[in-house]
């Protein structure tokens, strides 16, 4: 009986410590104030594709998982070697591994290597990619997350990584809300295309409020035995150099295109068939020219549909069955982005043309400011409540004794 009591007390102690840690992590977070954003404005139209070399596209995937933590984490069916070989069979130039909360050094001798990881283990999938990472941010908020929590996480990841990227923002309804991206700042890329979700509403919210945020696409692959895991959502980067720092530099400059390649809804397609379909049907952007106020786009294949999208995600103009599509940017258009769809269903998502006062004023100031007074007041209140609870528990124990 004594042994059972001891085990029971030990289990309760462990549970108590875990709950205390959970509460502490979730409540002792700095409080931020946020300035009101303002949309893009000005006479200068910035085209991230200016000077593009239409022959220099690199196929890149930065979001994929392999076996870690003894196979506990999702990705247990992927060895590093298997993932690498499958992506190389599809002709990928950069094959990134972004395991949960750990940086893989696989392929670190390859010039295109980019150290990265996926941060987050909360129930609402509020995750981030840390690319060019030097260190892993260990702390996350497993339960709810306020806007301050989301901003603080981006800030902290960015201290130890070149890029902090909100991942699959539309994955869970109670995760990232589109409205969050009205105020969130201090990030330069958003995973708009993910193997599980597309997130145009979150991107358009950021762009509509003047945040110069470019897109990235990621398979988020977890199993190389699943035909629909590799080569579905990825990024084409316009760069002559397949070198890690140059890839990140091109992404930040917006010199990239997001790809949504059609999946097999029956899950019966073979890998040889998909590779052949991929090689035959994958289009490449050949033109994204800004001639005065006219945006002209074209690709290596005819366009089944070209959509030009602006403020609030509203479709401004559509053209169908053309070799080249164009749109005259209106004075009231604060930004314009294009989505090109092809006969087989493949989509190319382009980064936006944005308005600015001048070429040297592309980025707006950050909106977040740490409110030391509110933080101190709130933390003092939390400590007082916790202290009061501990005092009541001790008093109750004394009475019982």
Give residue spans per PLM region.
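C-terminal functional module detector
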Residues: 1-52, 224-401
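A metal-dependent hydrolase metal-coordination microenvironment
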Residues: 25-169, 175-176, 180-185, 193-205, ...
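Short, well-ordered alpha-helical segments in soluble proteins
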Residues: 191-197, 210, 255-258
């Amino acid at each position: 009986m004594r042994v059972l009591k001891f085990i029971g007390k030990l289990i309760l102690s462990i549970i108590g410590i875990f709950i205390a840690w959970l509460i502490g992590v979730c409540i002792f977070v700095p409080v931020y104030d946020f300035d009101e954003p303002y949309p893009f404005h000005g006479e200068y139209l910035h085209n991230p594709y200016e000077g593009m070399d239409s022959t220099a596209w690199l196929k890149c995937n930065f979001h994929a998982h392999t076996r870690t933590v003894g196979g506990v984490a999702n990705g247990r069916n992927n060895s590093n070697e298997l993932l690498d070989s499958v992506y190389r069979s599809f002709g990928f130039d950069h094959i990134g591994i972004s395991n949960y909360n750990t940086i893989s050094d696989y392929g670190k001798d390859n010039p295109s290597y980019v150290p990265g990881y996926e941060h987050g283990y909360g129930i609402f999938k509020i995750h981030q990619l840390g690319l060019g990472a030097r260190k892993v941010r260990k702390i996350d908020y497993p339960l709810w997350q306020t806007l301050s929590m989301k901003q603080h996480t981006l800030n902290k990841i960015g201290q130890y990584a070149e890029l902090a990227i909100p991942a699959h923002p539309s994955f869970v309804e109670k995760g990232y809300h589109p409205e969050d991206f009205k105020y969130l700042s201090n990030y330069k890329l958003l995973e708009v295309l993910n193997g599980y979700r597309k997130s145009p509403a979150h991107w358009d919210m950021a762009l509509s409020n003047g945040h110069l945020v470019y897109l990235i696409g990621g398979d988020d692959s977890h199993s190389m035995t699943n035909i629909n895991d590799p080569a579905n959502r990825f990024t084409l980067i316009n760069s002559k150099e397949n070198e890690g720092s140059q890839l990140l530099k091109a992404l930040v400059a917006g010199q990239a295109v997001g790809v949504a390649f059609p999946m097999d809804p029956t899950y019966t397609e073979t890998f040889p068939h998909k590779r052949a379909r991929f090689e035959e049907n994958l289009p490449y952007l050949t033109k994204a020219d800004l001639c005065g106020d006219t945006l002209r786009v074209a690709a290596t294949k005819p366009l089944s549909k070209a959509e030009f999208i602006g403020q609030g995600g509203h479709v401004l103009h559509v053209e169908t069955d053309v070799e080249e599509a164009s749109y005259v940017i209106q004075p009231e258009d604060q930004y314009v982005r294009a989505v090109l769809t092809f006969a087989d269903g493949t989509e190319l998502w382009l980064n936006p043309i944005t308005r600015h006062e001048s070429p040297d004023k592309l980025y707006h100031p950050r909106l977040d400011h740490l409110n030391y007074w509110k933080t101190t007041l709130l933390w003092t209140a939390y400590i007082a409540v916790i202290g009061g609870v501990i005092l009541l528990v001790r008093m109750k124990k004394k009475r019982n004794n």
